[in-house]
Each structure stands twice: as C-alpha cells, then as structure tokens.
Amino acid sequence: MCNETCPDGRRVRPALIALGFAEPYIFVTFPVPLAATPVRRDATGARLTVNHHPTPTDPITPPGAIVLHVFAHSDVGRTREHNEDAFVVADLSRGDPLSFDHLRTERAGNRGTLFMVADGMGGAAAGEIASEMAVEVVLQQLRRRWRDAKTVDPVAFVGTLKAATEVANATIHHYAGDHPELRGMGTTATIAGLLGDTLYLAQVGDSRAYLVRDGIAIQITKDQSLMQKLIEAGEITVEEAEMSDRRNIILQALGPEPHVKIDLTHQRVRRDDVLVLCSDGLSGLVKPEQIAQAVTEEANPELAAERLVDLANASGGPDNITVVIARFDGTGLESAAPVDEIGHRVFDSPELVTPTSTPPVLRVESIAEQIAPLPPELFERTPTPVERQRRGKLYVRVVAAVGIVLTLFFLWQVLTKL
C-alpha cells in the first residue's frame, strides 16, 4: 500500500483500518517522509513496533529458493483529483506489507506471498475508502487465518483467500450501511497468492492479472463485466468490447451486495515468468502486447512499471493507474516447457463449494465497533445523492439487461435450429 507521500504528488492516504476480529487494533497511516516508519497502534492507542523495511534477500540464495523481484506503483492519472486504487504486496510468513520506494528482491516464504490490486467506485471518498478497506481487511484476515495455520496446502490456501475476500465484502457492505452517504461504495479485487510454484487467484470485478512468458502476455483472470458476458455469448467481439462505451460496467464488486461471487483460479509459474496485476486504468489503455514488450525489454520491474504508467498517461490517463509487477526467479522454479499452459484455469475443489444462500461465517455484529472513526479530511468530496442513485440503478439495470440479452441470444439459437 502507498504508505508515504507518493511520487506523483497526490495526497497521502488518510487513516485506514485493519480488522482483527479476535484481537482488533487500529492501523493508522500518517504523512511521513519516505524514510520514516509508519505508526501502528493497538486498541488502547499504544504504539506498536513495525518493521517497515524487511530484510532483503541475502546475496547467496539457498538451493530450492524462489526469488521475487517486485515493484508496485499507483498513479492518479491525468484527469482524476483523487486516487481510488489501492494495492498491497506482503510476505505471508511475516505478515508485513512491503514498501515500494525502490525495487524489492525477496525470497518467497513458506507461507506464500500476497499480491493484490483494488479499484474503488462510488465517488472519490467512497471509492478510496472501499479499496483501502479491501486491501487492509484481506491482509489482516490472511494474518489471522493463514500465518499460524496447521495445514499448508493448496485447498487450505485457496479457502483462506476466499474467506478473506468474503470478509472484505461483508465489512465494506456493513460499513456503507452504517454510513448512508457512502452507500453504493464498492471495489474490484484481484488477489494473487503465490504458494510454492503456483499462483492461486481470487477475482472480483475487472482488474486484471497477466502472466508474461517468452514475450507474450496472457490474461489469467476473467473480467466479471458486461462486456465479458456478451463476448462469451457471441454477441460482440473482443475488439468491439474494447471500443464500447459500456466497457467499464462490472457485474461483481466488493461491497454493494451482502454476498459476492468470487472467481477462483490457479496457474503454475516458471523461472523468468512475470506477473502483472493492474487496474483498468492501465489495461483499458495499454494492450497485452505492450505490457509484454515493456516487461520483456525492462528486466527491472520498477522500470517496467514506470514505462507502463507512462504509456497509460500518454493515452490520456483518464483513470487511476495501478500496477504490481513481480518477476519470478530462483532454483525453486523449473524452466518453462512447451507443454506448459497459461490461461484462466478454475480451481475446482468440493471442499470450497458452499451453498450460495448461506452467508460466510463472520462476526459481522461487531464490525461497527471495531472500525475506528474516520477523519473528516477523508470526506473532502463525498458522492452526491444523485451520483449514488444513478450508480445503484445502473447496477440493477445492467444485471437485468445481461439476463435479457443472454435469454434472447439462446432463444434465437434454438429457433434457428428448428
């Protein structure tokens, strides 16, 4: 997360929350110089010690290690006044998020590594709160549920990612319910967890994850959007979707509804693969070919990230731009082979299937008590009632429209076969 004054000059993120349902504490980020350490306080206000700059990888990498060269950056863009995007990268063995005033080189811990991008919606203040709340809650839940878990296996890991995402959705939804001026707030979430040599992903909305191998960028998430539904139904082409005025309409988000559909997938990684997570402020303007070219020509993820942000801004920068880039290295990974496949691969496990009518097991009754009052400066621009109402109605109409379009399409297919 951007815990300092960012290079683009935008204002520092205001006070945030991190919910620990067992032992709640408040995570407050203050405007500090890049070299300073952010302050964490417990529920009594006591100062907590934080390792802001984890020890980098030793010069000598032990055999079998997986090494990550990672950088993340968020830019406000050319037209927005506020940045509603958020991100986090964290070693789940330690639980501390990494700072990114420089390129980080880290050994992957045995508990995995978290990469996440969130793109808020609902107006400047609401979107900013939703995205920051999402990354804080997901990280906090992974600290609680995963760091001390007795079973370290893919099913348990994916189940933890899913549960953390559900808690984030419930938290944002309940918080908006307690603050009428923020109703309709929501955020996308693209969450990737590296465990061993495999990425496990939880997807909500239309932020994206790409894997770049041998100079080719392949999307390994699937947009939960109107355009994606119409593409799958054969109504429009990918090229038509990219030009559509409705390409930014999403069908799933954290916060607007009490329950959310989470797309769970997985992808094995090889040595020299590059993971790119980004908000649609990047993917909507920069084509996969350009992403692949940038990370291939710029082996340093920091330089690649700067190049991609510059490309998006050169195209007008109409939205916030966030990118997380991780290059995978080390003897713990195999070299790529021709038989390896890259793509949207569903993680299918009976142990993760739960009835859609059953809410996640959460202590939501105590959520309001565990959220610290937010500072007044966070509400410099709150969404107007007209903006919130328009966005809410659009969401309902879009969902209904998708059902109608798909029904008519399949009916037409049946009639043409008679």
PLM regions: where:
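Intrinsically disordered, low-complexity cationic segments
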Residues: 9-12, 40
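Intrinsically disordered, low-complexity segments enriched in serine/threonine/proline/glycine
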Residues: 11-18, 25
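Leucine-biased recognition of intrinsically disordered, low-complexity hydrophobic segments
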Residues: 7, 16-19, 34, 48
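PP2C/PPM-type serine/threonine phosphatase catalytic domain
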Residues: 25-418
